[in-house]
Design a protein with these regions (language model features):
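Acidic/glycine-rich phosphate/pyrophosphate-binding loops and surrounding catalytic core
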Residues: 1-198, 202-209, 213, 222-230, ...
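Active-site loop ensemble at the mouth of alpha/beta enzyme cores that anchors a bound cofactor
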Residues: 274-276
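Short secondary-structure boundary segments
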Residues: 218, 241, 263
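Cys/His-rich Zn2+-binding cysteine-cluster or related metal-binding knuckle/ribbon modules and their
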Residues: 245
Length: 276
């Protein structure tokens, strides 16, 4: 999976405008414009790299003379002390782009690292780790790319990717069966329907109505096991809601197909990378 450069450039230019505006009152007054410098991206912890091309693109857009030597690629496992890349170009431009570049690569690597940890915890089970739409506005493509770099899979990218009936949709439509029936009459054959359920009665109704994917929202492990047995061969089962690293393995061992974790994108810790 690669991010289109035209998309990256729009996002990066916006990030640069946020930080630099029209002048850097430190670098522009201290550093001669023709002074050249070098720097390194250095891993300060163990983790998974993501966002290197995005970070380097910050400097490319600021400085036509910028050059970089890469020692790692997105998806690589990093150890503390690893040199990720060496940078060279205008000293002033390296300083101007430093914070924006680090914000992006640290955030994306944090997501990839957290995802890789979750994926390791479910090894040997049937479950896949996915993200959600709980992403930061404007950063969804970068965040979902980072999940893939960490070994996870993407859930819906946006509301047009598939139909997901949550409790509010179901209540507004007059129940699970009626909601699925209404959608089936309007959706194309390529669009799957997922239904959020809160108990086994709702699981049974969703199965009978023909849902392809059933989400188990905050259900107990015992209820998950029963839902998996009920759905066998009929629908995929997704577990979601309040799942932590401590509960991840037991949830996976219930036999669910998918475990979606919003925390991978909405509250992940940044990965420590320095630029010196």
């Amino acid at each position: 999976m690669m991010l289109p450069q035209f998309y990256m450039d729009d996002l990066i230019r916006q990030a640069i405008r946020e930080d630099i505006n029209y002048i850097d009152t430190s670098a522009d007054y201290l550093i001669p414009p023709d002074q050249m410098g070098k720097a390194r991206f250095l891993a300060k912890a163990d983790g998974v790299l993501c966002g290197l091309s995005v970070a380097l693109r910050v400097f490319e857009l600021l400085d036509p003379a910028f050059r970089a030597q890469r020692f790692h690629a997105d998806g690589d496992t990093l150890q503390k002390g690893d040199i990720i890349a060496e940078l060279s170009g205008s000293t002033a431009m390296l300083l101007k782009g430093e914070r924006t570049a680090l914000n992006l690569i640290q955030h994306m690597s944090g997501i990839a690292t957290a995802t890789a940890q979750a994926v390791r915890l479910v090894e040997g089970t049937h479950a896949s780790i996915t993200d959600t739409r709980k992403t930061l506005p404007g950063l969804r493509s970068l965040q979902k790319y980072a999940v893939v770099c960490g070994g996870g899979k993407n859930h819906r990218y946006n509301l047009s990717d598939g139909a997901m009936l949550k409790d509010n949709h179901i209540d507004a439509a007059g129940g699970i069966t009626n909601a699925i029936t209404l959608l089936r009459g309007k959706l194309g054959h390529m669009v799957k329907i997922e239904v959020e359920t809160r108990n086994l009665d709702e699981v049974a109704e969703a199965l009978h109505a023909g849902a392809e994917i059933i989400m188990l929202d905050n259900m107990s492990l015992e209820a998950m096991r029963k839902a998996v047995a009920m759905a066998k061969g009929k629908a995929l089962i997704e577990a979601s809601g309040g799942i932590t690293l401590e509960t991840l393995r037991p949830v996976a061992e219930t036999g669910v197909d998918i475990i979606s974790i919003g925390a991978l994108t909405h509250s992940v810790k940044a990965f420590d990378i320095s630029m010196k």
